[in-house]
Regions:
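Nucleic-acid endonuclease domains
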Residues: 1-111, 119, 124-273
Length: 273
């Protein structure tokens, strides 16, 4: 058993799994009498990046892995400190050529939490922010700033999504052009110019909640450029792998990616399946 444990530890460390998790995984495999099965699987993992693309659940993705459900489910549920979120350990443990590459996200070049067969993947769980790093630190309660821009007569109902209050203000106003200019001033102030969110036109504001949708989608599309993002529903273990703007827009249109809140300057999204 000692040799097996050592062999497993080395393989897990090569995947950059933090030591606390390595010890837990070895202990779990020992308790479930699966050390030799785990060692054999780690030496020859069968699940590929293509399998990740074609599946939509961590449970079905790991179904072919020849280890007990008890073991697999505990690994899928692993999350905790040290910047490791749910799903990360499972993906790097069960997939071929996979390792954790996450850590401090100090620039938009930090493209992922995990790398699988040279594909970097960012993992986003519930209440995800799809917002570029260079503006993400601007998050704060926007009420005072909005009133400074639009005036005290802008009513922001507590508990609503503030873009809907701003949109209502626009629709009720007699000088729509003036309010549209103020909306674009807000976009510029909140999102660092127009590099992430393009200026909005009156034709973009015709549907209900169109400002909310516009801001959310523009921020997400800017963030997703050149990235692969896996959105995970931590309650169901279902996920969507977003590899393009089209993947994102299709899932937003179908309601699979849902806006949870917009309490500061940024939307929080969830994968709703």
């Amino acid at each position: 058993d000692d040799k097996l444990e050592e062999s497993i530890k080395v393989q897990l460390e090569n995947r950059n799994i933090p030591k606390a998790y390595v010890d837990f995984i070895v202990l779990l495999a020992f308790k479930l009498k699966e050390l030799s099965k785990l060692d054999a699987y780690l030496k020859n993992p069968t699940i590929s990046y293509e399998d990740l693309e074609t599946n939509s659940s961590l449970l079905t993705l790991t179904d072919p892995v020849p280890l007990s459900e008890a073991f697999k489910n505990r690994i899928i549920d692993l999350e905790g400190g040290r910047g490791v979120g749910k799903g990360e350990v499972a993906i790097v443990l069960f997939l071929r050529d996979a390792k954790i590459i996450g850590g401090r996200k100090d620039s938009d070049d930090a493209k992922g939490d995990v790398e699988i067969q040279s594909h970097a993947v960012e993992i986003k769980a519930d209440k995800a922010q799809l917002v570029s790093f260079d503006i993400a630190s601007y998050g704060s309660k926007p009420t005072a700033e909005l009133k400074r821009i639009f005036g005290e007569d802008l009513e922001i109902t507590s508990g609503t999504l503030w873009p809907n209050s701003v949109e209502q203000y626009y629709k009720n106003s007699e000088d729509k052009e003036e309010v549209l200019n103020l909306i674009n001033k807000t976009i510029k102030t909140f999102y660092g110019g127009h590099s992430h969110v393009k200026a909005i036109k009156d034709s973009d504001l015709e549907q209900p909640s169109s400002l909310l949708t516009y801001l959310t989608d523009q921020l997400a599309i800017s963030y997703l450029k050149g990235k692969n993002v896996l959105m995970l529903n931590t309650k169901t273990d279902n996920y969507i792998l977003i590899e393009s703007e089209e993947d994102y827009m299709t899932n937003r249109a179908s309601g699979a990616i849902k806006i949870l809140s917009f309490s500061d300057k940024f939307p929080r999204l969830t994968y709703n399946k």
